[in-house]
């Protein structure tokens, strides 16, 4: 019996190593062992309708950049390119594979557009952007699978970042009127610099939120109700700050603000080196407020 169970464990472990990504496409599944960009020898420009959002469900990297003209370019082999579905529905460019098993997939997708409102990845594929993206209206970036989103500088009226799975989001800089970021899974959010009016971050999962530099002309809010931590390294907030922990996650804040309302009802601490005018500190759990 022990030998049989050991063989079964080895078999299952080998199977997990052989399949790095499984994507539910609604009426079936896409199973991918390994996706690489090595061996690309075929390029196909897709004719698609106008879009202002991208929904990425491919198991590969999608490279997005801002340009005067809209273009969707599939770079692969001729065989694999034929399996890639690119369709626009209600202004959203949807990227997905035909149902099947792909032990080795050679693929990447390059997209340009003059403007964009939403970038979302739903599977194991990443979205990569470099440089500066100037959006006319609001921008939402979201990952709900294991895929990551990595972006450069962003200028928008309002900016929203959401991580609902294990995927991470890393952004070099954001300049917007309103800034909102939330985590409800195990993925981490990392921002190097944020310049905004209103600022709000929250985590309800195990993922962390980190921000190196913040300048907020209005009020700022940080809430942790899971096990994830929130770290705000260097902040300048002209308005008030509201800091709340109701779980085991900690909030660390360094910088200056007007007044502070800090409350912990769980085991998480609120700490840091923060200069302020007045503080209303409350603690009803094992967590402490030390600012």
Please report, for each region that a protein language model flagged, where it lies by residue.
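Intrinsically disordered, low-complexity terminal regions
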Residues: 2-291
């Amino acid at each position: 019996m022990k030998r049989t169970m050991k063989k079964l464990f080895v078999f299952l472990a080998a199977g997990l190593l052989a399949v790095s990504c499984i994507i539910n496409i609604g009426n079936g599944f896409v199973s991918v062992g390994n996706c690489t960009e090595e061996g690309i020898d075929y390029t196909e420009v897709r004719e698609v309708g106008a879009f202002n959002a991208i929904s990425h469900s491919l198991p590969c990297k999608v490279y997005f950049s801002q340009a005067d003209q809209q273009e969707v370019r599939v770079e692969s082999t001729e065989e694999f390119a034929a399996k890639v579905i690119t369709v626009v529905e209600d202004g959203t460019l949807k990227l997905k594979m035909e149902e099947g098993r792909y032990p080795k997939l050679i693929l990447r997708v390059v997209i340009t557009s003059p403007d964009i409102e939403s970038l979302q990845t739903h599977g194991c594929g990443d979205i990569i952007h470099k440089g500066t993206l100037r959006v006319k209206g609001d921008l939402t970036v979201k990952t709900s699978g294991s895929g990551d989103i990595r972006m450069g500088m962003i200028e928008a009226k309002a900016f929203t970042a959401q991580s609902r799975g294990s995927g991470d989001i890393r952004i070099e800089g954001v300049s917007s009127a309103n800034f909102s970021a939330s985590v409800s899974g195990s993925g981490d959010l990392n921002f190097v610099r944020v310049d905004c009016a209103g600022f709000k971050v929250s985590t309800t999962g195990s993922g962390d939120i980190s921000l190196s530099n913040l300048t907020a002309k209005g009020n700022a809010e940080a809430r942790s109700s899971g096990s994830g931590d929130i770290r705000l390294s260097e902040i300048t907030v002209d308005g008030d700050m509201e800091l709340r922990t109701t779980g085991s996650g900690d909030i660390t804040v360094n910088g200056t603000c007007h007044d502070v309302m800090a409350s912990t009802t769980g085991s998480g601490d609120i700490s840091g080196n923060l200069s302020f005018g007045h503080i209303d500190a409350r603690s009803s759990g094992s967590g402490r407020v030390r600012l």
